[in-house]
UniProtKB/Swiss-Prot annotation:
The gene is psbJ. The keyword Transport does not apply. Pfam families: PsbJ. It is a single-pass membrane protein. Belongs to the PsbJ family. This is Photosystem II reaction center protein J. It is found in: Plastid, Chloroplast thylakoid membrane. It comes from Psilotum nudum (Whisk fern). One of the components of the core complex of photosystem II (PSII). PSII is a light-driven water:plastoquinone oxidoreductase that uses light energy to abstract electrons from H(2)O, generating O(2) and a proton gradient subsequently used for ATP formation. It consists of a core antenna complex that captures photons, and an electron transfer chain that converts photonic excitation into a charge separation.
Length: 40
């Protein structure tokens, strides 16, 4: 974990991005499946 000063570690970027993508997809599919997506 050397030479990471002033930069965001790639593993942190990947983890946050993956979590956000999965969360957004989960909310989208859950809303569409439960019928809430059609009312938005």
């Amino acid at each position: 974990m050397a030479n990471t000063t002033g930069r965001i570690p790639l593993w942190l970027v990947g983890t946050v991005t993956g979590t956000l993508v999965i969360g957004l997809m989960g909310i989208f599919f859950y809303g569409a499946y439960s019928g809430l997506g059609s009312s938005l």
